[in-house]
Every structure is written in structure tokens, then in C-alpha cells.
Amino acid sequence: MDIVVNDDLSCRFLEGFNTRDALCKKISMNTCDEGDPFFVADLGDIVRKHETWKKCLPRVTPFYAVKCNDDWRVLGTLAALGTGFDCASNTEIQRVRGIGVPPEKIIYANPCKQISHIRYARDSGVDVMTFDCVDELEKVAKTHPKAKMVLRISTDDSLARCRLSVKFGAKVEDCRFILEQAKKLNIDVTGVSFHVGSGSTDASTFAQAISDSRFVFDMGTELGFNMHILDIGGGFPGTRDAPLKFEEIAGVINNALEKHFPPDLKLTIVAEPGRYYVASAFTLAVNVIAKKVTPGVQTDVGAHAESNAQSFMYYVNDGVYGSFNCILYDHAVVRPLPQREPIPNEKLYPSSVWGPTCDGLDQIVERYYLPEMQVGEWLLFEDMGAYTVVGTSSFNGFQSPTIYYVVSGLPDHVVRELKSQKS
């Protein structure tokens, strides 16, 4: 195993570390006064996810959703693996093109785009983009008339944790009119896309969306369009404790594709996985910078049923304005793990964990049983790769954590590609 540690804009490769070892090594290099928060990212985990994807969804080409985590090393790893990229803005297109990704491996998958961003996509050679209404077609007709448009349809995402169809997607009953207007505008519609939302607990939503896509596909073909792209969107789980497993979703998708889109050399099937690739690859380490004892409470929670003399409030140096913005915007539920080795029969106390800012909203964990922690000790949070680093701010002057990289089982060609990437 290797660990890659970024030092300003350079990287150095060390031998013999996994994620946990890297965390402990980095922490041992800090004193309590210097314990800034940091991530350890296992790029090898991303590679293993890719291998699982190819095994479970062999007909579907992944176009990684850049919005989920736009870290340079993540993008470089995925580019070396040959994935495509789902971009939502000119900046994301620029970022991906900047590491050498060709425009044909980019889909501009934002149904509602700023005109200047459409122009940037055109000038960058990015032709494939999504839309869901006639007004978007009119913008494209004026700005990028040679674009290859993919019609996004709405889905039943009522069981998803993060719902998207309330904002994006044309209703199936409206698609014929939209396609007819595209024909009048001489816009080339090449396929259909959808997104079932993130955190869904019902894999059958993919089956229904694929069935609806077939209906719209045939509608487009009837109107004279060369329909050859099916984009099944995102919503694939990436954490260890996901209630709906990726393999189960893949099985439903494969059955639906076999029924509605049997193998065809002219057909391209893509998806937009984000959290699937990166969620479990990142672990965040935060330092306990302050603590308070709170009045005792009577608890009755399974094995912890007892009258506790005290509970604790812990303050750490990252919060909801930083990496834990996922709690506010992605409905994440995080669990703190003490970095130190557990002590046998150590008493656990009801605890809350708070971020470092002056805002009372900055609470990371409302209630969790932990051993008593001391100022200067560390808490770890696993599965922190999705919608974390991309949403950080510098509110109150707190900066984003540094990312250190573990490389476990990475192929040589990926390592070479990473070394050639600029930070």
C-alpha cells in the first residue's frame, strides 16, 4: 500500500500505510495546539468501486458527477480509469477539461443553464447536454445550435432522501409537445435522461423510469430524431450502511434494460454516479478543542439504561459551515468514532458534538454515546467523501481541511496518471 501526502502543490508517495495507519501517523505528527482537521482519502477505494460497477452494470458507462466531490486527485483517478464526467456549470467543465478529459467524455447535465455557460460548453467542444423545457431549447438554438440534446423526464422520487423531480424533469405527458418544438427549432434531440433522487429505498423506481424512457424514446424516434442515448442518472449508494445496496439496484436496472432496451450497438447507456464513487473513500479527523459537562439525565436506551451523573458537550474544529455542510444540504447522519484505542468496559456517556463557529446552528451530532473525551483528542467520521469538501465555506475564518491520500492497490497506469496531474 502507498500513502500520498500532498504538501502545498506537490505530492510524495510513502510505503506501507492503510487509511487507519495514515490517520494515526498524521495525528502523531501534531500536538494538541496544532491539531487542524484533515481528511484521508483512499483512492484505492474509488478504484475498487469502479471494478464493482463494471461487474454489476457492464452495459452502463459511468459519467462521474463532479458536483459531488471535485477534488483534483479524485478527478484524476477517475479520468485514468476512463470514466466520463457529468458537469453542471462552466467551472466544472473547465476543471475537467483542465486535467485532459476530452469533450466527448463530458455531459453537461444541468437542465437549466446560464447562456454564457452554454456558450462556454460550445467553445469547449461539449455538445451533449440535458434539457426539460421549450425555453431551454430556445436558448440552445441561439447559442449552441449543434448541441446534442437529451430530454430529462421526471420520476417518482417520493421515497428518495434528496428529491429532484420537484425541480427538474418534464412530465411524460408533456414530452411530445417539447419534442415537436425541438423539431421546429431544428435542435437535435438524441436521447432521454432521468434521476430518481438520492437515498431512495425503492429500487423499482429505476425500473419505472427506464420504462418511461422507452416510451419517450419511441416518441422521439417517431418524430424523426436519432434517439441513441439513455442516461439513467444518479442515486447510487456509496456508504457502508446504505439500506438499499448497490448490487440490488444494479439487478433491477439490468432486468429493466433487458426488457426495454435490449443490447443494441447503436445505443449508449450512461449514468451519473457521484456518492457511489467517493462517499466511503474519505475519512475526516477532527480535534476536540473544548468540552463542557452538562447536567445529569435519566436515560433508557437499551444497554445504556442507567442514571448518568453527567453528559458532555464536545466542540471540534470543523462543523456545518465546513465539511459537515452535508448535514444541512444532503440530509447526512454522521457518527463520531474516537481515534484512540478503546478501554475495556469504559463507561459511555450521552454526548453532543458541536462545530467551532459562533452559530448555535453549528451542531454535528445531537446525541451519541461516547467515552469521556479530553481536549486534544481526536474524533473520526467515516463515509465523508460525498457533498462535503465541495460545500465548505470560510465562515468565521475557519478554513477547509487538508486532504491526504492513501493509495491502496492502485494500478500502475493510474499512479502514473496521478503523478502527471497538476494540483
UniProtKB/Swiss-Prot annotation:
Subunit structure of this chain's protein: Homodimer. Only the dimer is catalytically active, as the active sites are constructed of residues from both monomers.
Catalytic activity, as annotated: L-ornithine + H(+) = putrescine + CO2
Naturally occurring in which organism (per UniProt): Trypanosoma brucei brucei
UniProt-annotated binding residues for substrate: Y329, D330, D359
Binding site for pyridoxal 5'-phosphate: S198, G235, E272, P273, G274, R275, Y387
Active site: residue positions: C358 (proton donor)
Molecular function (Gene Ontology), one example: ornithine decarboxylase activity
Top-level EC class as recorded in UniProt: lyase
Name of the featured protein: Ornithine decarboxylase
Cofactor(s) this protein requires: pyridoxal 5'-phosphate
InterPro entries: Ala_racemase/Decarboxylase_C, De-COase2_C, De-COase2_N, De-COase2_pyr-phos_BS, Orn/DAP/Arg_de-COase, Orn_de-COase, PLP-binding_barrel
Described function: Catalyzes the first and rate-limiting step of polyamine biosynthesis that converts ornithine into putrescine, which is the precursor for the polyamines, spermidine and spermine. Polyamines are essential for cell proliferation and are implicated in cellular processes, ranging from DNA replication to apoptosis.
Any one Pfam family match given in the protein's UniProt record, by short name: Orn_DAP_Arg_deC
GO terms under biological process: polyamine biosynthetic process; putrescine biosynthetic process from arginine, via ornithine
Gene3D superfamilies: Alanine racemase (3.20.20.10), Lyase, Ornithine Decarboxylase, Chain A, domain 1 (2.40.37.10)
GO CC terms of this entry: cytoplasm
Pathway: Amine and polyamine biosynthesis; putrescine biosynthesis via L-ornithine pathway; putrescine from L-ornithine: step 1/1
Modified residue annotations for N6-(pyridoxal phosphate)lysine: K67
Family, as annotated: Belongs to the Orn/Lys/Arg decarboxylase class-II family.
Activity modulation: Inhibited by antizyme (AZ) in response to polyamine levels. AZ inhibits the assembly of the functional homodimer by binding to ODC monomers and targeting them for ubiquitin-independent proteolytic destruction by the 26S proteasome.
